[in-house]
Design a protein with these regions (language model features):
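N-terminal, positively charged nucleic-acid-binding surface of large information/translation enzymes
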Residues: 2-124
Length: 124
């Protein structure tokens, strides 16, 4: 795959792991591969931002919280912290790592959507 042009800015992410359990080798493999790509771009002076989050949405979250007899939000934060600790131990260099319910995620999702719509990439 050719490198992006140096004047392009790139947003990179990995698949968001559910915040309902520990990371497994598949999660780690993907994050390591993505981190290698990020480091290659940065070594070539290409501006990129590596973002990810623990997925806090959906049935897997509700079922696991019920199984653990805890509030979903509390469980999500505990697994998010665990995910970050595991990824840090592999020197994964996320610029931002939130949850899908965080204020930061809401802000950036709305910002990206608004900019894309204003630029004509989204019609409604």
């Amino acid at each position: 795959m050719p490198l992006p042009e140096k004047n392009n800015r790139v947003i990179i992410t990995s698949a968001l792991p559910y915040a309902n359990g520990d990371l497994h080798i598949g999660h780690l493999l993907e994050h390591v591969q993505t981190d290698i790509w990020v480091r290659l771009l940065r070594a070539n002076n290409i501006t990129c931002h590596y973002v990810c989050a623990s997925d806090a949405h959906g049935t897997p979250i509700m079922l696991r919280a019920k199984e653990l007899d805890t509030e979903p939000e509390k469980m999500v934060e505990e697994f998010r912290s665990s995910h970050m600790k595991d990824l840090d131990s592999f020197n994964i260099s996320h610029d931002n790592f939130y949850t899908t319910h965080s204020e930061e995620n809401k802000y950036f999702s709305e910002l990206i959507y608004t900019k894309a719509k204003e630029s004509g990439y989204i019609e409604s």
